[in-house]
From Swiss-Prot:
One Pfam family hit: SecB
Subcellular location: Cytoplasm
Similarity comment text for this entry: Belongs to the SecB family.
Gene Ontology CC terms, in alphabetical order: cytoplasm
Organism from which the protein derives: Stenotrophomonas maltophilia (strain K279a)
GO terms classed as biological process: protein folding; protein tetramerization; protein transport
InterPro entries tied to this protein: SecB, SecB-like_sf
Protein name: Protein-export protein SecB
Keywords: Chaperone, Cytoplasm, Protein transport, Translocation, Transport
Source organism superkingdom: Bacteria
Subunit description: Homotetramer, a dimer of dimers. One homotetramer interacts with 1 SecA dimer.
Amino acid sequence: MSEEITNGAAAPVDAATGPAFTVEKIYVKDVSFESPNAPTIFNDQVQPELQLNLNQQVQRLGENAFEVVLAVTLTCQAGERTAYVAEVKQAGVFGLVGLDPQSIDVLLGTQCPNILFPYVRQLISDLIQAGGFPPFFLQPINFEGLYAETLRQRQEQGDAPSLADSEPAGNA
């Protein structure tokens, strides 16, 4: 018995075969680049200061499907002036079948952003270079550590809802 797999996609997983974690789709949800002081900013000899903001959002799409969005904003200041602002929202749809809520929460908080991060890194670097600035490479992020910190904060607040507890999206 054989299963046909087309164009490199994973074969559908039957819930009866056991737990499964699948990447259904990866896509850019939003992208923006602004350089409000170009072209005069290119002549500045000021050491730039960078500020990185990272955010993750999870939305349940169905019983076994979740959208995870990894949002990154990188702001570069040259003295009092903004050199650029690069924003990327990289998203993925992930299938999680036959897993307990705690395992789902861990996967949504660690593995999903780890899968999306290389796409974010590449997009940020490409945007900045296309804007006429030297490349910037986002350094690896310890999503496991961030998840552990989030979990600790949730416990301090009295069991706030997990990532897997969100309601399915759609028309109500």
